Amino acid sequence: MPRDREYDQWGYSGTRRDGGGRYGYRDRSRDERDRFRDVRDRDRDRDRDRERDRGGYRQDPRDRRYSRSRERERRGSGSRDRSRDRSRDRSRDAHRPPPSGRPHQPSGHDSTKSSNSMSETSSTSQVTGTTPNTTNATPSQAEIDAKKAAKLAKVAEWKRKKELERSKSASASPAPSTAPASPKAGFSMSGLSGLRKATDQGQVKRKMFFGGDSDEEDAGRKPAKLLKKLGEKEGSGKSEGKGRGGSQSEAKNASEKNGAASEPAEVDPLDAYMSSLTLPTTTSVSIADSTPLENLNVWEQVDTLEKSQDPTLDLSALSKRKEIAIVDHSKQVYEDFRRQFYVESSELADMTEAETNELRLSLDGIKIRGKDCPKPISKWTQLGLPGPTMGVLNDLRYDKPTSIQAQAIPAVMSGRDVISVAKTGSGKTLAFLLPMLRHIKHRVGVETHTTTLSGASSHPLGVIITPTRELCVQIYRDLRPFLAALELTAVCAYGGSPIKDQIAALKKGTHIIVCTPGRMIDLLAANQGRVLSLSRVTFLVIDEADRMFDMGFEPQVLKLTQSIRPDRQTVLFSATFPKKMEQLARRVLSKRSSDSLGPIEIIVGARSVVASEITQFVEVFQNEKSKFPRLLEVLGKYFAQGFFDEQSEGRVGTGESAATPIPNPKCLIFVERQESADSLLKELIQSGYPCLSIHGGKEQADRDQAISDFKSGLVSVLIATSVAARGLDVKGLGLVVNWDSPNHMEDYVHRVGRTGRAGQKGTALTFLLSDQERLAAEISRAIKSSGNAPPAPVQLMTERFEFKVRSGTEKRHMYGFSGKGLERLQDERDATREHERRAYEGDEAGEAETESSTPAASTANTDIIPKPVIVVTPPDSKSPTTAYHTTLQINDFPQQARYRASSNTSVSRVIANTGCSITAKGEYYPPGRIPGPKDEPKLFILIEGTSERAVKLAHHELSELLVSGLVKGARYQV
């Protein structure tokens, strides 16, 4: 119904009481409703504001006129009102008298005006010699002045008492020397005459106390303001300390000034209290008195430069360094432990010396070096092992011991230090696990406090050290069945996995730890050595000992062995053990004065020999492209038949091969570089072969998963670098392919030893290029050591190489086990240190005194990189993007620096910034090696761009990345 008719029905339309006509009452009623609504809304808005101030504002569902957009505008307008209120309050506060105890601080636009007025007032007072007129002051101002005077009197009285107490304490102490004190670099709050004005390292360290960079900036700003005030009062001509009279005269002068000046300068009680305190002094070390960098070694140079850049590193440097505390064994009290657990059976005791030699000859020609070596066994029952251990051996179907087990287990159980060398796949792991378990089980039973895994039992009794992570995991898996039967525990610790999980496992308690050297050092250095201790270790095993030293682990291994008690039992196992490595490995053997027999060396077969169960093939190719079609042909035959064998020119020997098909056959392909592994993986996947790859550039979780999938049969082809050449045992692995030939004989033996294990047949195929004569000579040595003749093409390449060596055109570079990891280790360190020394010599003396957060390596050390030479590409270039190009040599820099400059992340960022094309080319050459005329050049980065400016910019950014990696590359990585 229309609104007018509604009013007519109620009788409001016919009366003209106010002269408004027909709609007069309606208008009046509407005005009343609007007035009521305004009042209601005002009250509601007031309630809403109250709720909002309390933090509990919530939209009223009954308020239909609520709108989020209008509410947002209302709040926004409120912020503008608050801004206007602040400006209004600021102008009001400018004319308000200062509060008691605080001098007036003019702010903003009126600072100039107030300062001018103050200067005029003070000058007038000085000229006339009279006080300013204060008769016009209001009563409130007079009250404020009276309060100020009373407060100053209290301050003067308080200071007088403090000075009296100080004089009493000074009289009780010895009288100081009458000689004037020299200014100190450090300072206290009671005396400031010795303060330095110049910026030095002392002031840099002082920032740690007085803030500026900390979160509590107000707390740091307060002492700074206090220093400024006290410095103005003290002056340079006054002495540091004041007596009682000085304090009273100072208070008197302050009170007189307060009565004479219109703006009295008074002392706040908090400031006065702070002035009585003495902050800890710091000693400033000048740059001139510090030790020059050239007198320090590389590691001290890096630490010194980093500390000068950031003073906070002084506090945390010790906690970040992975150092193991040196143990003084002469001051330690160790408990005696039992070593002898082997009792010769009557059956072996009745054997004569001739029968013993005949038995050793039948067991793959065992050779013994050492005194009083036990006789080899022929059955497990002759060892006297515990019942649970025998049960596990029966469950695993280990019918009888292998050659190395028959001789090594009795020797180790006799308590002797043993060096064992045996071919791959001969059961070396079980040869040291069984004696270790027998040794530790006895100690757990004897030591009552180790029966429960708590307290001191978190420290292991036995340690197994391996060179690679994959071997560490495999030994731990072989150990687990025996742990459950004997009620023992073990922890597997290796790099690439979270260390917190391994620390948690150690805290629960462990008897055996299987580890890599780097992670063991991490655990020993964690929490200042409170996480793990090797003081209770009495049985030490180093598996693949030769590779441990060859990979450069000698310093780490020596550190670990130094932390273990010297009368321990040490056992070394490996498949290859050159005499030079043997001399170095003997350094870790224990030197017991009570043991005059010395260690026992057991050699099964030759020192570096390929097992007779492996059929070897070596094929020579003219170029790299012809290798992949041959690989596809071999894989096709292998997976179709279950084995691979053919009468070809590259076959080694004429013996029988693996003619029996293998169920679920698997193939392992070895490459030399990580890039080769990734590229070959893509090509095989495109050809229809599902495969995986592992190398040192992958995460440890990915490597573990790849090996697990390969063992379970999810994939049949695995591509790997030499990280899988040691200890990897896979059932059904019947074919090993060396896509890239190994560079030394021992690596070849370990690679092909992944097949033909535990008496099974296997095949090994090696690809050689026609110009790889040096590698052919190494493979020829390995084949001859196994009692076979190398193929004719390989023998021809070997003869050519020997002729070049005799004529002097080639040098016989010995790789790997003849000194790769040890003889060149010091040369590589010296070369790295030389680069770092040159890098840090570029800094000027004045630059060390400046405060900078930029690393030194990225600011002034780019002088070691030559200036870019921009070359213009000929006009007939294939692409216009390569009109200009230059090169950046990275071969001679440390590995960390090379990685920083050539990683995908760094290259992508430089490409995005400059638009240049960046490619890594060449081949890495170790220090001291020079590429020949036909060899690839040293490793470098090719930079190509459309303009000279872009190429220079890309070269500059890559140079900074390269040099910034020197500091990290100089750090000791474990």
Swiss-Prot record:
Domain Helicase ATP-binding: 409-595
EC number per UniProt: 3.6.4.13
GO cellular component: nucleus
UniProt short sequence motif Q motif, positions renumbered to this chain: 378-406
Catalysed reactions, as listed in the record: ATP + H2O = ADP + phosphate + H(+)
One example GO MF annotation: ATP binding
Limits of the Helicase C-terminal domain: 654-800
GO BP field: mRNA splicing, via spliceosome
Residues that hold ATP according to the record: A422, K423, T424, G425, S426, G427, K428, T429
Biased composition (Low complexity): 113-142, 169-185
Positions of short motif DEAD box: 543-546
Region Disordered, residue ranges: 1-267, 815-867
Pfam family, one: DEAD
Keyword annotations of the record: ATP-binding, Helicase, Hydrolase, mRNA processing, mRNA splicing, Nucleotide-binding, Nucleus
Biased amino acid composition, Polar residues: 851-862
Domain of life per record: Eukaryota
Protein name: Pre-mRNA-processing ATP-dependent RNA helicase PRP5
Organism (species): Yarrowia lipolytica (strain CLIB 122 / E 150)
Name of the encoding gene: PRP5
